Amino acid sequence: MDIATALQYSETGEASVYNDGGSIGAMGERLPKGGKYAAHRTLPLPSVVRVTSVQTGKSCEVRVCDRGPFHRRRIIDISPAVARAIGCGWGVHQVKVETISVGDGPNQRRNKD
């Protein structure tokens, strides 16, 4: 996905809770135990997204630093810390995902909305 498209990305669908940290993500970084991170199939790495639970209305800013989910019906995998922050437990949840920014440091581009 190109940067302009990524900055306008917004989708509602299924999220699954995965990986409680310690493993190496797609960017070569160790996923932090208890950290707020996510995996997405097409957004540029790294990106920051807002994940909002459709059920609770709670939201959380999340760093996308891994690839997945590998289940076709799911749009994002979230860490257990993200699930707790949006009022969800383990399992599959309906969420809305909106891009806040793409890239890190001087290369970061923010959504203008």
Task: For the regions a language model picked out, list residue spans one by one.
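Secreted/periplasmic proteins
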Residues: M1-D113
